[in-house]
Amino acid sequence: MDLTVEPDLNSLITSSTHRWIFVGGKGGVGKTTSSCSIAIQMALAQPEKQYLLISTDPAHNLSDAFGEKFGKDARKVTGMNNLSCMEIDPSAALKDMNDMAVANNATGSGEFSDLLQGGALSELTGSIPGIDEALSFMEVMKHIKNQEQGEGDRYDTVIFDTAPTGHTLRFLQLPSTLSKLLEKFGEITARLGPMLNSLAGANNVDLVGKMSELKSNVEKIKEQFTNPDMTTFVCVCISEFLSLYETERLVQELISYDMDVNSIIVNQLLFAEYDEGDSCKRCQSRWKMQKKYLDQIDELYEDFHIVKMPLCAGEIRGLNNLKKFSQFLRKPYDPVADSKVIYELEQQD
């Protein structure tokens, strides 16, 4: 029996069970291009399904990649009926939270009401470390709740264009961290529930009930994130020492979280030995270095899908260019037969 792992993402792209796909790695290795490519190929392969691509990176690039503006509300990609994009904006989300708090306390008086009216809540929460990851996590919870209750837009799969590795690991730790915190909170509320509810204010907010509901939602997410049929992580790297080192750290962390990870996209490969005519010495030298680390990647991750993507002559921006580039996620790039594609990318204004 042939146990060779295919050097493509066909099994993921045609998957009928995955609900959450995370795409991440070191900064500057092509995470956004890779996440856009995966989302496009999934949408093309299964036109009857709806897909949502979310950027959780504070330095949003989805709008730049597609050449059209996306915001905090999901919007269809022009030219694709089953792919939507959104960029989670922490500052806008915090403003919404502050406005909601002001509205709920509009009849209140005193220092707390004045604090809210002054926007101090958003200023305070905006400075909390990890707030970007927490807001992204809230977005995940919102989608799970909407799908269970049949509210809002329904998406079969959500693809995350994540922040660089450190932010992403904090995001993925949130289910376990929140679960532990809420367990402790549960112990406290068992004794002090009525008192806590009375402290929630005159608006009759059932604080204990809200926390209990939050705990239930967090447990559902934790369960789904550790189910390999529902969630997977695609690592993105380039063939250099620092990127390889960070990829290995990321893989080990994901394994410790019981998350499925079995795919690596290696971007910006030169394939210089296949260049027509005399290739420049710098390209040949760099390709020699890339091959050295490619060999290490193949050896380290022999049971992974290793997808080797070429360095293109132009920018991979706009839907048409992304479609051309993303085809190599399904059909491995052939440096001889496919070399002209990397020179055919359309110029974007």
Swiss-Prot record:
Places the protein is found: Cytoplasm; Endoplasmic reticulum; Golgi apparatus
Signal peptide boundaries: none
Enzyme Commission number, as recorded: 3.6.-.-
Major location (coarse): cytoplasm
The name this protein goes by in its record: ATPase GET3
Subunit structure: Homodimer. Component of the Golgi to ER traffic (GET) complex, which is composed of GET1, GET2 and GET3. Within the complex, GET1 and GET2 form a heterotetramer which is stabilized by phosphatidylinositol binding and which binds to the GET3 homodimer. Interacts with the chloride channel protein GEF1.
GO molecular function terms listed in the Swiss-Prot or TrEMBL record: ATP binding; ATP hydrolysis activity; metal ion binding
InterPro entries: Anion-transp_ATPase-like_dom, ATPase_ArsA/GET3, ATPase_ArsA/GET3_euk, P-loop_NTPase
Group of enzyme by EC: hydrolase
Cellular component GO terms held in the UniProt record: GET complex; Golgi apparatus
BP terms from Gene Ontology: tail-anchored membrane protein insertion into ER membrane
Active site residues according to the UniProt entry: 57
Chain positions recorded as ATP binding sites: 26-33, 240, 267
Keywords from the UniProt entry: ATP-binding, Cytoplasm, Endoplasmic reticulum, Golgi apparatus, Hydrolase, Metal-binding, Nucleotide-binding, Transport, Zinc
Family annotation (HAMAP family): Asna1_Get3
Family: Belongs to the arsA ATPase family.
Record function comment: ATPase required for the post-translational delivery of tail-anchored (TA) proteins to the endoplasmic reticulum. Recognizes and selectively binds the transmembrane domain of TA proteins in the cytosol. This complex then targets to the endoplasmic reticulum by membrane-bound receptors GET1 and GET2, where the tail-anchored protein is released for insertion. This process is regulated by ATP binding and hydrolysis. ATP binding drives the homodimer towards the closed dimer state, facilitating recognition of newly synthesized TA membrane proteins. ATP hydrolysis is required for insertion.
Binding positions for Zn(2+) per the UniProt entry: 280, 283
Organism: Kluyveromyces lactis (strain ATCC 8585 / CBS 2359 / DSM 70799 / NBRC 1267 / NRRL Y-1140 / WM37)
